[in-house]
């Protein structure tokens, strides 16, 4: 029987963003009690992103309706620490990442990261890096922000992660920087070089079984759910095919 040899090119995409030109469509809702943030499409009313946050201790985060006024890639915060992907809401109140001791990605305050989902800040709204970056990239200056305690917000699909506090510093596990030690790693299994018989099935589900994705924070099964397979294998036509993950 004829056979097909598969050649693979692997590229793992970590996280995703939306068109920044659509930023003006969004309204950001914050619940100080549940410490959840929802980004809602102002036209459709649909939640496009849900996130855990840390608002101010003892409800010290301001309430009301505001519009964002500026953005800063890194910015000094109260207490001599720094935040990534900062967006000013009003006065000293910002959206930003969990604080860092220095403007270096491996200097995150690990204990503070584990407080996401609870009141922990001095008034600003803290987010995981992947979420702070999403707001920074997709919500332009002038985006409406509504902060309160009673609006029921959708919970995030992503589970809250806990990181080791054995060291007072470290990386945010959600930071999409490829240098992040938490960054998912994708490898092809030995079976990826096997030949497929003429006329056999080569579904995307089957092709996913040829790779192994690992992360220090997420199970392989959960990671595979987010892996996209591009390319088509026609086992009725002998030849070489390229499949991208």
Regions found by a protein language model. Name each.
Residues 23, 72-183:
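Exported/periplasmic cell-wall-interacting domains
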Residues 1-18, 245:
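Sec-dependent N-terminal signal peptides of Gram-positive bacterial secreted proteins and lipoproteins
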Residues 217-245:
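Serine/threonine-rich, repeat-prone extracellular segments and beta-strand-based repeat modules
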Residues 46-48, 63, 67, 82, ...:
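Extracytoplasmic/secreted proteins, especially bacterial periplasmic and envelope-associated proteins
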Residues 30-36, 81, 139-140, 206-209, ...:
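A short, compositionally biased
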Residues 182-220:
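Solvent-exposed, low-complexity, repeat-rich "mucin-like" stalks and linkers
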Residues 16-72, 84-85, 167-169:
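Cell wall/extracellular polymer interaction/catalysis modules
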Residues 62-63, 141, 198, 238:
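Short, flexible surface segments
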């Amino acid at each position: 029987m004829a056979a097909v040899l598969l050649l693979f090119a692997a590229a793992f995409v970590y996280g995703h963003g939306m068109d920044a030109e659509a930023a003006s469509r969004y309204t950001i809702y914050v619940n100080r009690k549940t410490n959840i943030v929802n980004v809602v499409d102002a036209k459709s009313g649909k939640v496009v992103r849900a996130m855990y946050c840390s608002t101010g201790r003892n409800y010290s985060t301001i309430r009301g309706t505001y519009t964002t006024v500026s953005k800063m890639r890194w910015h000094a915060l109260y207490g001599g620490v720094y935040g990534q992907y900062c967006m000013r809401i009003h006065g000293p109140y910002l959206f930003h990442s969990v604080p860092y001791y220095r403007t270096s990605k491996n200097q995150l305050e690990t204990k503070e990261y584990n407080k996401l989902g609870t009141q922990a800040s001095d008034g600003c709204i803290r987010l995981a890096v992947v979420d702070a970056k999403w707001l920074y990239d997709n919500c332009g200056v002038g985006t409406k922000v509504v902060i309160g305690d009673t609006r029921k917000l959708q919970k995030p699909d992503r589970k809250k992660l806990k990181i080791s506090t054995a060291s007072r510093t470290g990386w945010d596990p959600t930071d999409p920087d490829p240098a992040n030690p938490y960054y998912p790693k994708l490898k092809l299994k030995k079976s990826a070089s096997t030949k497929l018989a003429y006329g056999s099935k080569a579904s995307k589900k089957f092709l996913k079984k040829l790779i192994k994705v690992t992360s220090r924070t997420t199970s392989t099964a959960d990671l595979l759910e987010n892996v996209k397979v591009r390319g088509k294998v026609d086992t009725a036509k002998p030849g070489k095919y390229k499949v991208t993950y």
